[in-house]
Amino acid sequence: MSGLIAYCRQGFEPELAAELRDRAVLLGIAGDIYAQRNHGFVLLRCDPLHVDTLLQQLHWRRLIFARQTLRLHAELKTLNSRDRIAPILAALPKTPCFGDLWIEYPDSDMGKPLAGLARSFGNALRPVLRSAGRLSAQLHPQWPRLHVCFLSGDHVLLGSTRSVDSAPWQLGIPRLKLLPEAPSRSALKLEEALITLLTPNEREAKLRPGMQATDLGAAPGGWTWVLIRQHLRVTSIDNAALRPPLLNHPLVQHVRADGFRWTPPRPMDWMVCDMVEQPRRVAERMAVWLREGWCRHMIFNLKLPMKKRWDETRLCLERFETQAAVPLTLRAKQLYHDREEITVYASNDAR
C-alpha cells in the first residue's frame, strides 16, 4: 500500500478530498480517495512511483484543508489487542531507521477516546523499535519520523514524514494558550496564522517593532492585541468599542468607521481582517488593498458557506489573486482555531 495520509478538521473531509483530487490531477497523478465525513482524515492511494512527487507538492503548508500529510506505509485491521506490536513491526518498510515516533489518532469524535491508548502504546512500542534497530536511541530530527495513527483499538495506519516537511505538532494541532488579558478567543486565530502561514525567517523580517498595521473590523480587539504584542502600531477600525487592555494603549488608535469603506491615509505595512461577511466580498475588498498599495502584507479570514466549500474557496482565492493584480505570495489554511472558515496570508512581492 502506498499513498498519503492527511489529517483535517472533523466535517471537512469532503473538502480535503476534493482538494487532494484536484491537485493530484494537475500533477498528472491518478489515485483513489478514501474519505468519510467526521472521521478527521483522508487517504489518497496511488502508485508508489508517484508518492515522492505528491509529498513534495502536497505537503501540509501547500494544502488548505490538511493539518498534516504523511507517507502511507500500511493499513492494519483486526489487530489483536494482546499483541499489536508484532504486526506493526512486520509492516514497517525495510528502511529507514526512524528518528522519532509519534502515536496519534484523528481529531474527531471517533478518535479522541483513543488518546489514552495512544499514550500507553507509545511507551510499549518505543523500546521494542529501538531494540529492533528501527528507532534511534536519541531524537534525530533529520531522519524520518514514524507515525502510528489509531483509528480504533484494532485498526492502525502506519505513516512517516520528514520533520522539515511536516507540521511540527502532533495531530497537526498547535497547542496555544489564551492569556487572561486577551480581549477575545479570536486572538488564537491570528497567533496560529502567524506561526503556520509564515516561516520563522519571515516573521522576523516582516513583523518588526514600529511597523504600521490596520485591523479592519477590530472589535473587541483580539487581533489588534496580537499585533501590539509584536510591538506594531495598530489602527483599529470598527464602529464598536474595543475591550481593555486596548483602551488608551499607546500603540493603538481606534477609528470608529466601517471596515469595508475606510481607506488608510498612508500605506501600511500590514492589514488584518476577521469580519463576518460574504467571502467573495471580503476577497474583493482585500484585493483592492493590495492593488492600491495600501499595505504590503495581509492576513484575512474567509467565512465559508455550508455547501460547496472547496468550490467557494477556490473561486475566492482565484478572484483575489486576479483582482490584486500584483505579484503575490499567497497561502491559505484552515487553522485549528478556525471554524467554518479559512485564513489567508498574502504579501506583495513587488514592494
From Swiss-Prot:
GO terms for cellular component: cytoplasm
Give the primary localization class.
cytoplasm
The record ties this protein, via SUPFAM superfamilies, to:
S-adenosyl-L-methionine-dependent methyltransferases
Q: What is its EC number?
A: 2.1.1.186
This protein is called Ribosomal RNA large subunit methyltransferase M
Q: Which cysteines are joined by disulfide bonds?
A: none
Q: Which gene encodes it?
A: rlmM
Q: Which GO terms describe its biological process?
A: methylation; rRNA processing
Q: What does this protein do?
A: Catalyzes the 2'-O-methylation at nucleotide C2498 in 23S rRNA.
GO molecular-function terms, A-Z: S-adenosylmethionine-dependent methyltransferase activity
Q: Where in the cell is it found?
A: Cytoplasm
| Species annotation | Xylella fastidiosa (strain M12)
Report which reactions are catalysed by this protein: cytidine(2498) in 23S rRNA + S-adenosyl-L-methionine = 2'-O-methylcytidine(2498) in 23S rRNA + S-adenosyl-L-homocysteine + H(+)
Q: Which InterPro entries match?
A: RlmM_FDX, RlmM_THUMP-like, RNA_MeTrfase_FtsJ_dom, rRNA_MeTrfase_M, SAM-dependent_MTases_sf
At the top level of its lineage, which domain of life is listed?
A: Bacteria
UniProt-annotated binding residues for S-adenosyl-L-methionine:
S186, A219, P220, G221, G222, D238, D258, D274
Quote the subunit structure annotation. Monomer.
Entry keyword set: Cytoplasm, Methyltransferase, rRNA processing, S-adenosyl-L-methionine, Transferase
* Active site annotation, chain numbering: K303 (proton acceptor)
Family of the protein in this entry: Belongs to the class I-like SAM-binding methyltransferase superfamily. RNA methyltransferase RlmE family. RlmM subfamily.
